[in-house]
């Protein structure tokens, strides 16, 4: 009996490594730029990293709404030999909460990026023809077609989303009631 238990335990110890995924935590940014950073720090880091093609304050815009700033960079126009194309850095209350990196499709294909992300971070939490999404408590990272990588600070995004909720129209409420009755 003891030999059987020992054999089962040994088998379990040997088989577990084959089924456990050795993945990294989802990153909260790229190229030294991370979600939650203040505006001035992001500007400084963008200046130091030529891969993004940042040209200084002329790339900074104010967005409609309260406390919203956008930095838009263009690595292709910056004559930088980059794997990146246009990148967007969106701020709320002076802190970075969305990073969108458009990847140069002439240099990298969608499948290569998807395969690399799966190997590093495991399988996506959700998958559709349009996008693949990886999530943890603080960050959502999505790979979207044609070839964009997006990082979102979940807490800030949810806060802004709840502030902007518009009541449903009568048609929407009726539709919901119909669907609930099915």
Regions found by a protein language model. Name each.
Residues 21-66, 93, 98-182:
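Non-cytosolic coordination micro-motifs
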Residues 15-19:
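C-terminal segment of classical bacterial N-terminal signal peptides
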Residues 5-14:
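Sec-dependent N-terminal signal peptides
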Residues 60-78:
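A low-complexity, Ser/Thr/Gly/Pro-enriched, surface-exposed linker/loop concept
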Residues 79-84:
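A glycine-rich, hydrophobic loop/mini-helix early in the fold
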Residues 5-6, 46, 71, 178:
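Sequence-pattern detector for short linear motifs
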Residues 85-90:
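Hydrophobic/aromatic beta-strand elements that line small-molecule binding cavities or substrate pockets
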């Amino acid at each position: 009996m003891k030999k059987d238990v020992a054999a089962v335990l040994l088998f379990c110890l040997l088989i577990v490594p084959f089924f456990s995924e050795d993945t990294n935590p989802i990153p909260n940014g790229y190229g030294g730029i991370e979600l939650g950073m203040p505006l001035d720090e992001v500007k400084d880091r963008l200046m130091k990293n030529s891969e993004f093609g940042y040209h200084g304050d002329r790339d900074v815009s104010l967005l409609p709404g309260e406390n919203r700033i956008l930095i838009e960079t263009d690595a292709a126009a910056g004559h930088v030999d980059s794997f990146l194309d246009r990148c967007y850095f969106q701020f709320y209350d002076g802190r970075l909460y969305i990073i969108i990196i458009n990847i140069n499709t002439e240099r990298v294909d969608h499948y290569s990026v998807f395969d690399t992300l799966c190997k590093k971070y495991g399988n996506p939490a959700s998958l559709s023809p349009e996008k693949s999404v990886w999530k943890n408590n603080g960050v959502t990272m999505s790979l979207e077609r044609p070839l964009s990588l997006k990082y979102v600070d979940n807490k800030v995004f949810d806060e802004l989303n709840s502030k902007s909720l518009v009541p449903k129209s009568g048609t929407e409420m009726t539709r919901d009631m119909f669907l609930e009755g099915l």
